[in-house]
Structure formats: C-alpha cells, structure tokens
UniProtKB/Swiss-Prot annotation:
Cofactor note: Binds 1 FMN per subunit.
Enzyme Commission number(s): 1.7.1.16
Catalytic activity: N-phenylhydroxylamine + 2 NADP(+) + H2O = nitrobenzene + 2 NADPH + 2 H(+)
Record carries keyword Acetylation: no
Pfam families referenced in this protein's UniProt entry, alphabetically: Nitroreductase
Residue sites binding NADP(+) per the record: 44
Gene Ontology molecular function terms on file: nitrobenzene nitroreductase activity; nucleotide binding
Protein's recorded name: Chloronitrobenzene nitroreductase
Species for this entry: Comamonas testosteroni (Pseudomonas testosteroni)
Record pathway: Xenobiotic degradation; nitrobenzene degradation; Xenobiotic degradation; 4-chloronitrobenzene degradation
Keywords from the named record: Aromatic hydrocarbons catabolism, Flavoprotein, FMN, NADP, Nucleotide-binding, Oxidoreductase, Plasmid
PANTHER family named in the record: NAD(P)H NITROREDUCTASE YDGI-RELATED, NITROREDUCTASE
Keyword Flavoprotein in record: yes
First-level EC class: oxidoreductase
Length: 227
C-alpha cells in the first residue's frame, strides 16, 4: 500500500509552540506558506479566509495595544463568538483540564496563580515573541460550514510552515481582541476575527515547548460500518 512518510511525519511532528527565538522570518517564506495554503478545499470553492500578516512596527503596535486592552478590562474581554460551552462537559472537560495542568506546570503557574495566568495571556497577545503574527478574519454573514473550511486552511498553514522548519501556535484567543484589531487593522464591519497565529523559529529550550499532548486511540473516535 503506497504511503507518504513525509506528510505523515509532518502531521505527527507538528506541535504547538509557545515561545520563539528572536530571529526574523523572511517575508518571502511567509508568502510561500500562504501561497500553498490557498489550495485548501472549501465548500463550493467559497474560500472564506482573509489573512493579515503582522511584522516589525505593525506587529509591535498591535501587540502593545492588545496587552493594554487586556490590562484595562478587569471584567474580561468579549469574544466575537462562543468558544466553549459553560460548563464544559465530558469527555472534553477531562482533556481540557489535563492540558491546563501540563501547561501550568510548564509555565510555572497553577490554576490559583492569577498573576502567572495573566502573564501567560499577555504572552499570547505578544504572539509568544514570534517575529510574525497572523490574524484571520471571515465575513460574519457566512455560516458554520465556513468555519470547517477555515480549520482546514489553518492546518495547511501550520503544515506548510513545519515543512520549512518553522513552528506555529494557533490562537483562538485573538478573537477577544476584535475591537483593537478593528481599529489597528482597519477591519471592515462585516469581518469577524476568527483567530490569530504565531509563526517563527521555536525556542525549544523553553519548558513549555517540551509539552507533548496525548491523543485518544483510533477506536475511541472511529466507528467502522460494514453493513
């Protein structure tokens, strides 16, 4: 049976990285990644994605504004869309709590460490020091099918980046920053913020970048129907 070890390895080896080296990414490399990702399939070829690439002064301006907005919102920021149900039910709650526990250990903060948790969120809004920040928007008049297409698009970006030696962190949390992004990027009112993504060269000396989350076995999420 023919296989594609390179593709398989890319999928298995891709990890979310939450700390990056102070090393620039050539803009041509970013263009190459997005030029490959544009071949993502979408429902009836609607291609719902729109991407903003932040580097240099623009990245600094947006991240500074985002951190200031977070610090100035003691009641919390409001997302563009509902992220998780409350309360989160099983089996998802167990998986979520396992991840949060490992992340807290790697970041050196527990769930009760409010200061440490806020410091982590601020790192998110600095793109974890990655030299490239990506912001993704979508026409808010579109429906759920377009979110499915968008997930495929984001995965292709991450795989294309990994194939070039780069790493990424997809960040739904950036949907909380839609007022800042609307101002800083002059987003049209019909565009909703779907997510952000950090892109760069991972700093693998960081404990948080040593995390490796488990996956459930095939039999737990697959039903084979023969008749």
């Amino acid at each position: 049976m023919p296989t594609s070890p390179f593709i398989d390895d890319l999928i298995r080896d891709r990890r979310t990285k939450r700390g990056f080296l102070d090393q620039p990414v050539p803009i041509e490399m970013v263009k190459d990644i997005l030029s490959v990702a544009k071949y993502t399939p979408s429902s009836s070829n609607t291609q719902p994605w729109r991407c903003y690439v932040l580097t240099g002064e623009a990245r600094e301006r947006v991240t500074t504004a985002a951190v200031e907005a977070y610090r100035g919102a003691p009641e919390g920021l409001k997302p563009e869309y509902s992220y998780f149900p409350e309360p989160l039910h099983e089996p998802y709650a167990t998986r979520f709590n396992s991840f949060r526990g490992q992340l807290g250990d790697a970041e050196g903060c527990c769930r009760s460490d409010i200061t440490g948790r806020r410091r982590y969120v601020e790192r998110q809004f600095r793109f974890f020091d990655a030299p490239v920040g990506l912001i993704f928007t979508m026409d808010r008049r579109l429906e759920w099918a377009s979110f499915i297409c968008y997930g495929c698009f984001l995965q292709n970006i991450m795989l294309a980046a990994k194939g070039r030696g780069l790493d990424t962190c997809p960040q739904g949390l950036w949907s909380l920053q839609h007022p800042v992004l609307r101002t800083e990027l002059n987003l049209p009112d019909d565009q909703m913020v779907v997510a952000g993504m950090s892109l760069g060269w991972a700093d693998n000396s960081m404990a948080v970048n040593q995390m490796s989350m488990s996956r459930v076995e095939l039999e737990e999420f697959t039903t084979f129907v023969h008749e």
